[in-house]
């Protein structure tokens, strides 16, 4: 079981840990929310340092840039590839071919710039309120969304690919365990505000459903790029939803 945790850390982060990878990579999906909680806590702690001297803009930038660093930029790269393929391609095969091209096109660049700007704005609002638990929750729920898509949609490439080992063996049990763990880790912080908890999970599920729908429509399934993209989009949706809650209520 711990081999799944080792695989999850090696897959989702820049950190190197001792131990053997799981024989079945889908078993690492159980641990995705746990790794997300660790990364979210790390980023929130890094944001606290500049915020302690009153520099909320830098605190927000630290979370955005730090998130790219600790994930090796893998998820952001997935978003760029997905944007280039989905909006710069044509038929299914052409779209998949573009997504495999390492070159970032105009749609990918626009997606990354929009992501960074919107994340910075949303996190700025959260740091101004000292909402570190919300920052961490966005990262956690981003990894939950990856599990939900992997467990519910087929792999799009017939020849397989980097993420096929995760998607091929995933099922309802992985989704249920990941969802339960996510609730267990977030509930202690938001049990006094069930509306906010509902809002966070609602934003995450909306992001997952949106990306899943687009991916099924465009390529008939998901790829590693799509799993990376859904993590980034979920973080953005969760942080924007939390920011709106602070603004409106």
Curated annotation (Swiss-Prot):
- State the annotated membrane topology for this chain: Multi-pass membrane protein
Q: Which GO terms describe its cellular component?
A: plasma membrane
The residues the entry assigns to the signal sequence are none
Keywords of this protein's UniProt record, alphabetized?
Cell inner membrane, Cell membrane, Cobalamin biosynthesis, Magnesium, Membrane, Transferase, Transmembrane, Transmembrane helix
Classify the main location: membrane
Function, as annotated, reads: Joins adenosylcobinamide-GDP and alpha-ribazole to generate adenosylcobalamin (Ado-cobalamin). Also synthesizes adenosylcobalamin 5'-phosphate from adenosylcobinamide-GDP and alpha-ribazole 5'-phosphate.
Under which name does UniProt file this protein? Adenosylcobinamide-GDP ribazoletransferase
List the catalytic activities from the record.
alpha-ribazole + adenosylcob(III)inamide-GDP = adenosylcob(III)alamin + GMP + H(+); alpha-ribazole 5'-phosphate + adenosylcob(III)inamide-GDP = adenosylcob(III)alamin 5'-phosphate + GMP + H(+)
Q: Which PANTHER family match?
A: ADENOSYLCOBINAMIDE-GDP RIBAZOLETRANSFERASE (PTHR34148:SF1)
GO molecular function terms attached to this record:
adenosylcobinamide-GDP ribazoletransferase activity; cobalamin 5'-phosphate synthase activity
Pathway participation: Cofactor biosynthesis; adenosylcobalamin biosynthesis; adenosylcobalamin from cob(II)yrinate a,c-diamide: step 7/7
Q: Which gene encodes it?
A: cobS
- Any one GO BP annotation for this protein: cobalamin biosynthetic process
This protein's cofactor list reads: Mg(2+)
């Amino acid at each position: 079981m711990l081999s799944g945790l080792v695989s999850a850390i090696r897959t989702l982060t820049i950190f190197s840990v001792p131990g053997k990878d799981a024989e079945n990579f889908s078993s690492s999906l159980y641990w995705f929310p746990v790794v997300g909680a660790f990364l979210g806590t790390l980023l929130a702690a890094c944001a606290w340092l500049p915020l302690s001297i009153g520099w909320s803009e830098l605190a927000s930038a630290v979370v955005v840039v730090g998130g790219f660093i600790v994930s090796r930029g893998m998820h952001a790269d997935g978003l760029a590839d997905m944007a280039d393929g989905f909006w710069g391609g044509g038929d299914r095969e052409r779209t998949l071919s573009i997504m495999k091209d390492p070159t970032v096109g105009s749609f990918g660049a626009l997606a990354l710039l929009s992501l960074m700007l919107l994340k910075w704005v949303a996190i700025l609002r959260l740091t101004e309120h000292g909402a570190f638990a919300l920052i961490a929750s966005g990262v956690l729920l981003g990894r939950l969304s990856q599990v939900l898509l992997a467990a519910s949609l087929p792999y799009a490439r017939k020849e397989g690919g980097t993420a096929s080992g995760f998607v091929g063996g995933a099922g309802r049990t992985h989704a249920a365990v990941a969802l339960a763990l996510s609730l267990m880790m977030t509930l202690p912080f938001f049990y006094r505000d069930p509306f906010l908890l509902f809002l966070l999970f609602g934003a995450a599920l909306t992001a997952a459903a949106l990306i899943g729908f687009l991916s099924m429509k465009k390529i008939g399934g998901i790829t590693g790029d799509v799993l990376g993209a859904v993590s980034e989009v979920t973080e953005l949706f969760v942080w924007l939803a939390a920011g709106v809650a602070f603004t409106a209520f």
